[in-house]
Design a protein with these regions (language model features):
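Acidic, Ser/Pro/Thr-rich low-complexity regulatory regions
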Residues: 1-113
Length: 113
């Protein structure tokens, strides 16, 4: 799954893009959470205490030890196989709250576009 391009537009637009990609199944929940987390706090301007964003901040925090994306190339196959089981478990566990939060974010952040 490839990540959506999020290097232009407002933080809200970028989050809506990632959230839609999660809903469409184009990116995983964990990968999407990591991207959404980048737009929270600091210079990005989105408040990570927002209930819908908090869902993704929490998922990112709880799964930050899991190899998702390009870092997988640096992992040994046997270790990766074990982590893949944990990734699958986490994706299933977080699926419902992530999809709910993603749908809220898309509705909120695409309302004015």
């Amino acid at each position: 799954m490839s990540l959506p391009r999020t290097n232009s537009g407002t933080a809200e637009q970028n989050v809506a893009q990632v959230a839609q990609a999660i809903l469409d199944g184009r990116i995983s929940i964990i990968a999407g959470a990591r991207q959404i987390r980048r737009f929270c706090g600091g210079h990005a301007g989105l408040d990570e205490r927002d209930p819908d964003l908090t869902t993704f901040v929490a998922i990112d925090s709880e799964t930050d030890d899991l190899p998702v994306g390009d870092v997988r190339q640096y992992w040994a196959p046997d270790a990766l196989a074990q982590k893949d089981l944990e990734i699958a478990r986490c994706e299933a566990m977080y699926r419902e709250p992530a999809l709910e939060a993603a749908s809220h974010l898309v509705a909120r952040f695409t309302r004015d576009t």
